[in-house]
């Protein structure tokens, strides 16, 4: 993804038999790749959960707190750290360095872990408030990778990827800039005022 200039989300799975050194080496490898290519948007620190495919035990809270803190310390500040709030106690981890709650939906299931429902919006708002994070819809591509005129004010652009003039392909840039209802909606979400925005009273 980095060599191709694609903004990318990656992560580590916690509780599959790895040790502390494995976790640290994985996080440092992600950092090194981002320093080389500038493409890592966020790192998901995901705990394993019991399901029909595995008998791994879910990591305890102290383990998750430590791994999240390791991720925040290892990664550059522009790379977000996230935990899936339907799999981890996000409210107990927000003080350890998470700054994104990931792709959640009040209207769909978690297709990867369907037995684990998304928290409701009020629950997510409480977690976001506890961490001082705004709770709002965002695009899959982080704001720093968006083109001029779409990227929100105050967000510095990521340096252009090697061998390309932009992070977003021309067809996607055209879609975002379109004058129709879909283009307007995408631009609204990019600014943080999309239709599913949840604001405090």
Features from the language model and the residues they span:
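Short gly/pro-enriched beta-turn/loop segments at secondary-structure junctions
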Residues: 9-11, 38-39
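Glycine-rich beta-alpha junction loops
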Residues: 14-17, 47-49
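Auxiliary Fe-S-binding modules of radical SAM enzymes
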Residues: 24-28, 34-201
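Radical SAM/AdoMet-radical enzyme domain recognition
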Residues: 1-10
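Canonical radical SAM enzyme core domain
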Residues: 15-22, 88
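A generic short-segment signal for beta-strand/edge and adjacent turn/coil regions
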Residues: 12-15, 72
């Amino acid at each position: 993804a980095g060599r191709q200039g694609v903004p990318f989300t990656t992560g580590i799975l916690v509780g599959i038999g790895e040790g502390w050194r494995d976790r640290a080496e994985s996080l440092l490898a992600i950092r090194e790749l981002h320093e080389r290519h500038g493409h890592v948007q966020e790192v998901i620190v995901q705990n394993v959960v019991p399901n029909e495919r595995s008998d791994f035990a879910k990591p305890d809270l102290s383990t998750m707190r430590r791994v999240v803190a390791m991720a925040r310390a290892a990664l550059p500040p522009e790379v977000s750290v996230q935990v899936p709030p339907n799999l981890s106690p996000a409210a107990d981890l927000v003080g350890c360095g998470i700054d994104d709650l990931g792709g959640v939906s009040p209207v769909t299931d978690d297709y990867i872990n369907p037995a684990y429902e998304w928290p409701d919006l009020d629950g997510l708002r409480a977690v976001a408030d506890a961490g001082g994070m705004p709770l709002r819809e965002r695009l899959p591509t982080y704001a720093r990778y968006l083109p001029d005129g779409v990227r929100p004010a105050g967000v510095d652009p990521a340096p252009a990827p090697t061998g390309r003039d932009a992070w977003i392909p021309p067809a996607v840039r055209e879609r975002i800039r379109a004058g129709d209802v879909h283009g307007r909606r995408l631009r609204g979400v990019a600014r943080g005022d999309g239709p599913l925005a949840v604001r405090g009273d």
